[in-house]
Amino acid sequence: MTRVVLAAAYRTPIGVFGGAFKDVPAYDLGATLIEHIIKETGLNPSEINEVIIGNVLQAGQGQNPARIAAMKGGLPETVPAFTVNKVCGSGLKSIQLAYQSIVTGENDIVLAGGMENMSQSPMLVNNSRFGFKMGHQSMVDSMVYDGLTDVFNQYHMGITAENLVEQYGISREEQDTFAVNSQQKAVRAQQNGEFDSEIVPVSIPQRKGEPIVVTKDEGVRENVSVEKLSRLRPAFKKDGTVTAGNASGINDGAAMMLVMSEDKAKELNIEPLAVLDGFGSHGVDPAIMGIAPVDAVEKALKRSKKELSDIDVFELNEAFAAQSLAVDRELKLPPEKVNVKGGAIALGHPIGASGARVLVTLLHQLNDEVETGLTSLCIGGGQAIAAVVSKYK
């Protein structure tokens, strides 16, 4: 079977809700990465066969945001593109689709990843197309409903985390401690420059003066403690334990990479970072969507012909501390190998981009001692996706 490799994997900094990227459309964040990847690799843009980009909150952006990003990023009009929505798994699903297209021989080079600007998601006025006869009307927050609401139970994703709290007996202190650890790891990694190799700075033009250049993730907090987090009120349930402090944020960002056949990478003298070994997807009861990575991980390992003990580093999306703790308990993961540079609770969770973001962060950790990695994300609606990669040799 064709060996599929990953190269030139990058991400933007992750902006907080209403932060530095509030006026930067998702497709511009994606275009910044596409332009950088083309420049860095020296690849002829016309040699790219296809562009596949995850993006969840598409309303108001225009037709097919992936196509917009591709053309704004400097690709010729002859290169096709399409947008993927698998909620939080969109970015990783895009990479899987690229992988599949190469294995089948349809493509040799695909630009794949994810992008999201949650700050720019619009308010909707449903059923207003043909006007209202009388009475008050209300707006629907497209970010909350299309991105963060379980449509089957009509409640926020945070309630699915509360459901896992009850099922697994997870305490508030455990969640807050997990969140503090995520922040501390991210602070340490940021201060030590450990994200520098994976981040492409984003220049934001200003009406007056020089552009603002964003180089670091905005959500990383130095002075977080369990004591401070314990003062926060429950966010989703009156007597609950899930708070804004032990959940991932609402964020803006993008992540992208080249997915190639090994033969094409050799032909073009592009040095791969890793080999894609296999993927796994799984579905569960939407009310406990956060536990779905357990089976997705097991499927990915089976398809990769690996055991959990073979994995040197894990990048698992931290949708909620409770969700992460439940998965860790089921899989019995070694904590020293999981999210060693912090996770989404600290870095942020731009939903359509996160699947690609966790893989980018993973790829930049592979070396002669850390040769095999696994990444996974839970997905609203009761799903999960996982992937296994190995350092290219």
From Swiss-Prot:
Listed under catalytic activity are: 2 acetyl-CoA = acetoacetyl-CoA + CoA
Q: Where's the active site on this chain?
A: 88 (acyl-thioester intermediate), 349 (proton acceptor), 378 (proton acceptor)
Disulfide feature: none
Q: Which InterPro entries match?
A: Thiolase, Thiolase-like, Thiolase_acyl_enz_int_AS, Thiolase_AS, Thiolase_C, Thiolase_CS, Thiolase_N
Gene3D superfamilies this protein is in? Answer: 3.40.47.10
Annotated GO MF terms: acetyl-CoA C-acetyltransferase activity
Keyword Acyltransferase among record annotations: yes
Cite the Pfam families for this sequence: Thiolase_C, Thiolase_N
Which keywords, in A-to-Z order, does the entry hold? Acyltransferase, Cytoplasm, Transferase
**Compartments, record wording:** Cytoplasm
Q: Which GO terms describe its cellular component?
A: cytoplasm
Can you tell me which family this protein belongs to? Answer: Belongs to the thiolase-like superfamily. Thiolase family.
List the protein's name. Probable acetyl-CoA acyltransferase
